[in-house]
């Protein structure tokens, strides 16, 4: 499948655009998988293209598994690019953390007219990184949200993460 690739530095967002064979004014911003061109993303693209929907796959950054202060301006830049391609109907799809991103973006940008959020949170979490720290795979970043807009972190629910007394916060619930 042919695609156009986008980078944060040059285009304002990280992703790939997959155009239908036939003319369509519909597109989905698809945020599943770890990369906009991995197997999961391509599977979603194939399914949507077969149904006449153009697809813009996106992820935070190349192999970036942390989620902290993700600028909603990236979604905004993607929407602007789609509108410049004569796309009039824009949907957004995400799963887990990107499901929360899909809901948040749809609440900010009225150009999004369809939102599918698979297993999102009910609220925006504190931003986090992934790797190895304190015996954990993920850990929160102090003072950072999952998302930001216009340089400001969005309000968030903090994690109860204070090793070694993390367990104490659980018994006081």
Per-segment meaning from a language model:
Residues 29, 56-58, 93, 117:
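Structural recognition of the beta-strand scaffold that forms the well-ordered cores
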Residues 1-23:
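N-terminal cap/lid segment of alpha/beta-hydrolase-fold proteins
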Residues 32-65:
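Short substrate-entry loop that stabilizes the transition state in hydrolases
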Residues 37, 80-154, 161-167:
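Primarily recognizes the serine-hydrolase "nucleophile elbow" in alpha/beta-hydrolase
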Residues 171-173:
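Conserved small/polar residues in nucleotide/adenosyl-binding loops
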Residues 25-33:
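Short beta-strand element of the alpha/beta-hydrolase
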Residues 59-91:
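Catalytic nucleophile-loop/oxyanion-hole region of alpha/beta-hydrolase
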Residues 42, 46, 73-76, 80, ...:
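Amphipathic, non-transmembrane alpha-helical secondary structure
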């Amino acid at each position: 499948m042919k695609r156009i690739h986008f980078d944060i530095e040059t285009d304002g967002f990280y992703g790939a655009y997959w155009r239908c064979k036939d003319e369509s004014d519909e597109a989905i911003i698809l945020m599943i998988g770890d990369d906009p061109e991995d197997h999961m993303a391509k599977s979603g693209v194939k399914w949507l293209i077969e149904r006449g929907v153009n697809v813009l796959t996106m992820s935070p950054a190349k192999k970036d598994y942390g989620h902290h202060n993700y600028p909603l301006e990236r979604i905004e830049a993607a929407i602007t690019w789609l509108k410049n391609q004569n796309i009039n109907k824009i949907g957004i799809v995400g799963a887990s953390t990107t499901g929360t991103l899909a809901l948040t973006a749809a609440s900010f940008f009225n150009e999004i007219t369809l939102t599918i959020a698979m297993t999102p949170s009910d609220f925006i979490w504190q931003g986090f990184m992934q790797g190895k720290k304190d015996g954990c795979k993920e850990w929160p970043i102090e003072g950072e949200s999952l998302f930001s807009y216009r340089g400001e972190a969005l309000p968030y629910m903090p994690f109860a993460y204070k090793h070694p007394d993390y367990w104490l916060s659980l018994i006081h619930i």
